Amino acid sequence: MTAWILLPVSLSAFSITGIWTVYAMAVMNHHVCPVENWSYNESCPPDPAEQGGPKTCCTLDDVPLISKCGSYPPESCLFSLIGNMGAFMVALICLLRYGQLLEQSRHSWVNTTALITGCTNAAGLLVVGNFQVDHARSLHYVGAGVAFPAGLLFVCLHCALSYQGATAPLDLAVAYLRSVLAVIAFITLVLSGVFFVHESSQLQHGAALCEWVCVIDILIFYGTFSYEFGAVSSDTLVAALQPTPGRACKSSGSSSTSTHLNCAPESIAMI
């Protein structure tokens, strides 16, 4: 077991705790309304409630979407930090898992596509975290439009890879868990998108709740990689970064595969 096992768990714990902290700050600063509030008005008078308590009158501008919670300081600063740190950790997890599957001689287009979608998800998170929806709406929506579909595709691809590589009952149990998480992510993401395009306050609030469930669900999915990351080593990262031709080369005098580019002349002649 290596310290890498803590990386996926840290991503889940740090990000989930962080976004709920951002939400709490936004509610206390009257920037959004609580998730339990389903009553919205067309307009509101100045809120007489003191800072530190939730708003007593809400409009559609106060729907507690995750992005909306991180739109204004001071919570926007924490939101950007979470987005940046989360994006880095997501990219690192994707790269390590890609290299780990290569070490197991599981070379497939699914693994490569999963790496691409995971890194695309990370890039989208960077944009979402640094361009707040109320200040750079177009860029924020572009980032969200990249991050959410890419994250969902990454989840689905790794469900397939989990079933493909299952050799023990516990492997199958993890694959089942990931399948359940993938289904939940798909349903909530679709519902969130469908509800979000409507002007109804009830549907807008429903979109916010679905978005929260979807994001937390995907973060939990990333956390499940701790199951495999106990076997990750520094060589795993080397395997992920190794040029493709070198992975199939064998060192002289050995029957085992080497990560060094010590190929036979016949292989070089084919290039």
UniProtKB/Swiss-Prot annotation:
Belongs to the DRAM/TMEM150 family. It comes from the Eukaryota. One of its GO terms (cellular component) is plasma membrane. Signal peptide: none annotated. Glycans are attached at residues 37, 41. This is Transmembrane protein 150A. The keyword Transmembrane applies. Keywords: Cell membrane, Glycoprotein, Membrane, Transmembrane, Transmembrane helix.
